[in-house]
Amino acid sequence: MGRPKPSSEAEQQYRADVELAGRRGDLLGAAREAESRFRQAQDRNAPDAEVRRLAEDLDAALTAAMRAAYAAQRAEIGPLGYDDRIFRRKKMATPAVHALTAQAEHL
């Protein structure tokens, strides 16, 4: 009697999360750039329409970065975490997952 195997759906979700987590650095960089453009527009008193567009771009970039950060958390937990809540809770208590959770919540 060994450890239960994750479902095929859990495996698919895990692969998708690993792929998204791999782009986390690029997405964080894009969010930094979007924030910089937004702040520069505010500093130079740009028209409201431009500031709004840049704010929406920043929001989209931060949302993508946050999704990637939470995907990294789920990827660190592993595919069994999608099916087994006890396994997930145990993994959530590890330092690596704590660090990833803190990064995601910081966004």
Regions found by a protein language model. Name each.
Residues 23-34, 62:
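Short amphipathic alpha-helical heptad-repeat segments
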Residues 35-46, 72:
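Secondary-structure edge/capping motif, primarily at the C-terminal ends of alpha-helices
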Residues 57-77:
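Amphipathic alpha-helical coiled-coil segments
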Residues 1-5:
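N-terminal acidic, proline/glycine-rich, low-complexity intrinsically disordered segments
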Residues 77-107:
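Amphipathic alpha-helical binding modules
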Residues 7-28, 40:
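Short, charge/polar-rich alpha-helical segments
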Residues 48-59:
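Short, charged, amphipathic alpha-helical segments
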